[in-house]
UniProtKB/Swiss-Prot annotation:
Name recorded for this polypeptide: Pyrimidine monooxygenase RutA
Gene3D superfamilies: Luciferase-like domain
Oxidoreductase in keyword set: yes
Known catalytic reactions: uracil + FMNH2 + NADH + O2 = (Z)-3-ureidoacrylate + FMN + NAD(+) + H2O + H(+); thymine + FMNH2 + NADH + O2 = (Z)-2-methylureidoacrylate + FMN + NAD(+) + H2O + H(+)
Organism annotation: Agrobacterium fabrum (strain C58 / ATCC 33970)
Described purpose of this protein according to its UniProt entry: The FMN-N(5)-oxide reacts spontaneously with NADH to produce FMN. Requires the flavin reductase RutF to regenerate FMN in vivo.
Residues the record lists as binding FMN: I49, K50, N115, E124, R140, Y141, S190
Gene: rutA
Main EC class the enzyme belongs to: oxidoreductase
GO biological process: alkanesulfonate catabolic process; nitrogen utilization; uracil catabolic process
The keyword Oxidoreductase is assigned to this record: yes
One Pfam match: Bac_luciferase
Source taxon at top rank: Bacteria
Amino acid sequence: MEVGVFIPIGNNGWLLSENAPQYKPSFDLNKAITLKAEQYGFDFALSMIKLRGFGGKTEFWDYNLESFTLMAGLAAVTSKIKLFGTAATLVMPPAIVARMATTIDSISGGRFGINLITGWQRPEYSQMGLWPGDDYFGDRYEYLGEYTSVLKELLTEGQSDFKGKFFQMDDCRMKPVPQGDVKLICAGSSNSGMAFSAKFADYSFCFGVGVNTPKAFAPTNERLLAATEKSGREVKSVVLTMVLAEEKSEDAWAKWEHYKAGADEDAIKWLGLQSAVDTKSGSDTNVRHMSNPVSAVNINMGTLIGSYEEVAAMLDEMSEVPGTGGVMLTFDDFLEGVEKFGKYVQPLMKSRQHVLAELEAAE
């Protein structure tokens, strides 16, 4: 099973809490995290794109770097780990994204991939006068399908004459093409999002579900497998998971309860209000899941809490769910979290023994 890190390009990472570590994003911080992840054999690092935050007392995600330029910098200082940047497709034309991806591919020696998002939070785009209207919620995956068709043509052939509803290319050229295979990731969990991933993506992100219920995301994998059976393509699921691991289980649980006690209710309320705007995509979207009040303090991503042994065992359980290709991990304190995972959790995981062997061989 692959393991990646969802690096904190936005302030405070993925905890909407006054009691969680408070920090602003910087290149130096993300460089240190990514280099540490590479040291411990993590397979990839991915950064999101967020153009407007949720506010609240913690000013959650009000401070953000830009994904592609951050990953370009990280490409220059890493050597093995795969890097994924996120394209906000509403404001980044596919020909420009293809050229930026080719540039980062050159910097990294073929280690770059793209996470494609449609955009769900209207204020991110309306603040710039670039929101296309709320009808977009209903046809955003049709838009993304055309976008990706253009992108793939440019990345593989260096030229596109694509003609569609949203995009019309006129002998659009983009050379050189990348040296590496630029993998595509999508995080859609609605029916249309799943269909898109099955047709175009190499990986599909899904949310882990619940606290210490490692296999609870299995129904999402089942839907993806059904969609790929129709498309005839293999697409692996990558599961978003927060890890709170300590030597003693009670210490990890004490952290979790402390973070929940300091939940930033104003920021959580903003998330809920924004998720309610989309009335066209159905009830199974990622943003609906994120805004569920059950565990909104970390946007309801699957959470594994316990001793190093307990967390390792739960991650191995996740690897056994059919269709799982990997996990993408977040932490409360990323530098400390990656260190503890690499030193104490990963060595106990059956699903990561191949990585330990590779690390030993490289010493």
